[in-house]
Amino acid sequence: MNMMQVMQSVVWAVLLWPCLVSLGVPLECKDEQGSIILCASISKEKLLDRVIQHAELIYRVSEESCTLFEEMFVPFPMRSQRNQAGYTCATKAFPIPGSKSEIQQISDKWLLHSVLILVQSWIEPLVYLQTTLDRYDDAPDTLLKKTKWVSEKLLSLEQGVVVLIRKMLDDDMLTTSYYEQGVAPYALQPEVLESVLRDYTLLSCFKKDAHKMETFLKLLKCRQTDKYSCFLH
Amino acid sequence: MLCFSLSQPRGKHKLNYTQFHPISKFVPSPHPRGLHISPNERFDPHHRWSHILCLVLCSSPCYFVSLLLYPSVQAPHLTGCKSREQETFRCWWSPGSFQNLTEPGALQIQYWKKNDLTKEWKECPDYSSSVKNECFFNKNNTVIWIKYCVRLHSESQNKTYDTLCFELQDIVHPDPPVALNWTLLNISRSGLNYDIMASWEPPPSADVSVGWLTLVYEVQYRRRNSSHWKVLEHEFGTQQSIYGLQTGEAYEVRVHCAMRAFNHFGEFSDVIFVHVPEIPNKESTFPVTLVLIFGAVGVAILLMLIIFSQQQRLMVILLPPVPAPKIKGIDPALLKNGKLDELNFILSGAGMGALHSYPPDLYQDVPWVEFIELDADEPEPGEKDNQSSDSQRLLGHNNHHTNHGCFHGLSIPDDDSGRASSYDPELPDQETLMLMAALLSCQPNKVEPCLGNCSHSSTPSLDVLEVPCPGLQAPDLPPEGGERHLVQTQLGGPQSWVNMDFYAQVSDVTPTGGVVLSPGQQVGAPENTPTTKKDKKGKMEGGEEESEEEEERRTNKLKFQLLVVAPEAGGYTTESSGRQMSTPDPSSPGEVYHTFPPPSAESKPHQEAYLPATTLLGDYQSPYILPDSPPAQFLPPVSDYTVVQDVDFQHSLLLNPPSPQRSPTCSPQPPSKPLPVMPIGYLTPDLLGNLSP
């Protein structure tokens, strides 16, 4: 997977060379492992823009995947879960404030760290989701492609956030997570309602967390450009 | 009852939705708590359609019956919850048609959040005063990414009529954009269509700048009287261009926005009207095309007129006549009828100055002592390429010549008695042949030096030769600079040979190989030596050859020999044979006439000496012609060269006109030519025709 990632990044680097020259270096910048070093130097602003782009894209694709899955597999009464108490997404290790005012008061460091934790917590479940979706008989190709794409982009987002943290917070203590192919925790048969709902829950929760990531990063960006107005509301 | 239940499926579901416990987690199970789903509905995504179908089928009779029996009964329910800016939200409910619940306060909105500590339903924080049945949650009570559940509850009856769960970001319906405006982009050339750019601003309530909300916009437009809105693609920016509107039509444009990726579009903005009046055509295309057509026709007519009126001139311009051959400054009439004397006069330069402006006499009294430097210049390529036959060349210079002096041993390697100064023994034979021809004519024109294969790089060019023809350069001309003016075309008209001395004798040969020349004879007896083919090898034999040649030159002043070079033969006549042949007696022209292969016996020793040299050049067959001088008429002293008088049937050249007693054996002479008079060397076409090939 890493090799693929590296290859992909190299190909993209070659193809987008003029863009890269003007915009900077792609996010895939692994200095510590002696792998392909594509980073020369990228400014914080450009890196942040790039990371935000990633987050936005991930969010959009996750929303599309959720909708696709809902249409295909989830029975009608259960859609949108309007009338249900709701599912519980996996709780995170840290509480995330809910209101906008509270969130705006969160420090930069906290924002970045929470983004990183969110990203890292979703890498493995998405891989699991991919394997589960493969077992569905009539899963549409687009759905599979989207989930695959999302899990890949999540990795690059993680790397970008790590670099961002290093640049903005001078925090060198973080390491990127290494994906290991884990055993699927649930071995239920696909297309049983339970598994369907579970997968649906997974997708919905991921969509929510993707939205969180995007929002945090955008708040961060706002602070970079105009600190005063960002704290005003 | 069936119709009633069918017509109100939602209420039915809600009525059964009583077992929900707010604290309990949702555990995926076939029958989720609080949601009654009939078994056959559970796995059937299309059960809604069956509902509708049944509704349709049963609606009319059942509905009216139910209406009669039961006035429309509708339970209280939540109509919806919406947020405008993701910071607050509102919920609305409807009390329904239940009679006992219409009074205010009978129904309450209760809610709870997932992260509440108490896990209890709370009362709506703010029942809005302005709008009926609305509950407003302000900023302090609003959290994002956390599940809310709102229920419609009746305390008195302790009954929940409806519940709704959501998260804040899922219920965002942004306000409509403001300041919608349009600007004209362009109008098509026909004036029928135009494009506009519609622009707007995000709703003020949405905090887009901070990034709290990311909006996507959708523009719709339609014709004034149409009912169908055309929807354009979602746009992330705040402007959108609309193409292809028609002038004269009124359009309506509106826009609404939604949170990105949630697709809950808010309300539409106010409609703006777009109208562009028709622009009358300033010009119609019809006259333009008419003008163009008329213009083209007029131009065509004009051209025709010009052509017809100026036909002659045009013909001359387009198809110029082939010029008749002529020599500059010479009347072509002269050339026709054999007025050779006049022609010669003219060509000698004494006539018009348009001819080659050589000073007429140069060499006559100039002592010629010079050293020839033999350079291996390559002859000019242009002159090498001339491959016309040698006989023709020579014949062009033939009989009418007296070959005084104009014939220098151009590349006559040996037997060059009487060779002119600056003679280059290295010249290839073809070149020498050419040169000889040129010299015969004694014209200061150029001659194509090569009759055959002239690619001997080692052989010096003709430059070295300085033919002291009249009008030639000074003796001090550097050999390589001598170039082609020495070599003259055979087209150069005949030259008067009389009283011209074109040649100089080689009086001595220096040890280094230089040739010392002495002035030639006063009488224009061209001195010549029989030539032979010469190549490198000949040059290599240089020294002794030189001495030999010089000696021969000295001695053999008379004879021109005609050498027809055959590949097997050496193709040259030695000095001795030349001597032998060079009798001043015109009465024995036959002896003068030699054609190879049969060389004379005396010449054999010499021939053998030179044979190897000559046989190397055996690949070309160009007859190597030495003009033979008709001795008696002009030259009391020795003359080495002879004018080719004729060509006999064997393709051999007759150097001297045969004596009358020998005439039968010789080819007929050109009838128009008096023998005693040395012909000028210009062979007119009619004369040539008399020569049998």
Swiss-Prot record, chain A:
Keyword vocabulary terms for this entry: Disulfide bond, Hormone, Secreted, Signal
SUPFAM superfamilies from the UniProt entry: 4-helical cytokines
Tissue: Pituitary gland.
Coiled coil: none
Classification via PANTHER family: SOMATOLACTIN ALPHA ISOFORM X1-RELATED, SOMATOTROPIN,PROLACTIN
Organism: Oncorhynchus keta (Chum salmon)
Signal peptide residue numbers: 1-24
The protein's name in its UniProt record: Somatolactin
One GO MF term: growth hormone activity
Record localization: Secreted
GO CC terms: extracellular space
Keyword Secreted attributed: yes
Annotated function: May be associated with ion regulation and reproduction.
Disulfide topology: C29-C39, C89-C205, C222-C230
Family label: Belongs to the somatotropin/prolactin family.
Any GO BP: positive regulation of growth
